[in-house]
Structure formats: C-alpha cells, structure tokens
From Swiss-Prot:
GO terms for cellular component: cytosol. One of its GO terms (molecular function) is RNA strand annealing activity. Keywords: Chaperone, Cytoplasm, RNA-binding. This is RNA chaperone ProQ. SUPFAM superfamilies: FinO-like.
Length: 212
C-alpha cells in the first residue's frame, strides 16, 4: 500500500522532490537553476499526491531556491531546467547579480548573528576574582624562579578565513592535526564547508578549521 502520510516540513518535501525529480532537484553540491514558473509545473505533477500541499510545496521551493548552494549555482552560461532536467533559457545577468547580492546578504546576516552570540557567551562567563592583598604579598616573598631559556622561534600564526567570503573552487588549508593540509572548496553551507584534499578525499569541516 502506498504511503499517503503528509510530509511535515520543507526539509522533508525537498528530500521528496529530490527523489521524485532527480534530474531537476539536487541533494548535494551546486543546485541547478530552476525554470521560471516551475511551481505551477510541480503543482500540476503533484496534484493527485496526497502527501504534499500547495502551501508546503511553495514554502519548500522558497527554502530550496534561497539556500547558499542554489545561489552559488546561478552562474553565467547556466541554463534553467524543467522537472525532467531539460535545459531551457539561459540565466540573465540581472538574475545572476540578484543571486550574488542575496547570497552576500544571507552570509552577512548569519555571521553577524554568530559574532553577537559569541560576544554574549563571553560576557556571561564569570570573571576570576582579583587576588587578595595578603595572598599577593605572600607570593611576592617567594624566591624568584631562575630565568627561563629563550623561547624557540615560532612560525607566524595561521590566518583564519573570513567565512562570508568563501566560494566554490577557492584554495584553502584545512587544520588536521598539527599541520594544515591544502584543499579546494567544493560546497559552502551556513554551518560548514565541503572540501576536497589533494588526495581526492572529500571532507565536511567547520569554518574554524580553515586557514589561508
């Protein structure tokens, strides 16, 4: 018996669309630009599908087309596709610029929010009490330790990436263990980055593990 239980949220609907129309909707990597008016095509194709409502479908489509990986895929020379993956009209310069601006604003909002949350967390951390005068005096009476040996020269600090400026095919280094490893960015999301090492291995890492 076919499952007719309604899909509960946009994430489930997008996963269903990927399964139903694999030549159009992509689960990982850069998404394909969708045909203008594709919502109407979806509504017609899924008219008899009890699992999807038009309201939820519209919301899921909006989420899919505003995702970073979808906006990353809107480039010059790319053609929009229909539900069966057939190419149609090429993207216009206006649509490409709009996608770049939307991507930039979305990244700025996300990383500004993260910086604010980090500052608030630091402010909530209890401060260590200042040492009492008696303790300070006692410490000053202790014999001074012998001078330490000159420190060994340390390499220049690694430069952390600006997550808001990361883009596909950009060269970075991934901090794995003691030394960074060269890699190439393959996908950027709100939470992490997918990179490919020189060995061909694909990894998904957090922004704080990337350096230049």
């Amino acid at each position: 018996m076919e499952n007719t239980e309604k899909l509960k949220n946009s994430k489930e609907i997008v996963a269903y669309l990927v399964e139903k129309f694999p030549a159009c909707f992509i689960a990982e990597g850069e998404a394909k630009p969708l045909k203008i008016g594709i919502f109407q095509d979806l509504a017609e194709r899924l008219a008899d599908d009890a699992r999807v409502s038009k309201t939820m479908l519209r919301s899921a489509l909006r989420q899919y087309t505003s995702s970073w990986r979808y906006l990353h895929g809107l480039k010059a020379g790319q053609a929009r596709v229909d539900l069966d993956g057939n190419p149609g009209e090429l993207l216009t310069e206006e649509h490409i610029e709009h996608a770049k601006q939307a991507l930039k604003e979305s990244k700025e909002r996300v990383f500004a929010s993260r910086r604010t949350n980090t500052k608030e967390e630091k402010a909530k951390q209890p401060r260590r009490p200042a040492p009492r005068k008696a303790d300070a005096a006692a410490k000053s009476d202790k014999p001074k330790a012998a001078p330490k040996a000159a420190p060994v020269a340390v390499e220049a600090p690694l430069v952390k990436v600006d997550a808001a400026t990361l883009k596909v095919d950009q060269g970075v280094r991934v901090v794995l263990g003691k030394s960074p490893v060269p890699a190439t960015i393959k996908e950027v999301t709100k939470d992490d980055v997918q990179v490919q090492l020189q060995t061909g291995m694909m990894l998904r890492v957090k922004f704080e593990h990337l350096v230049l």
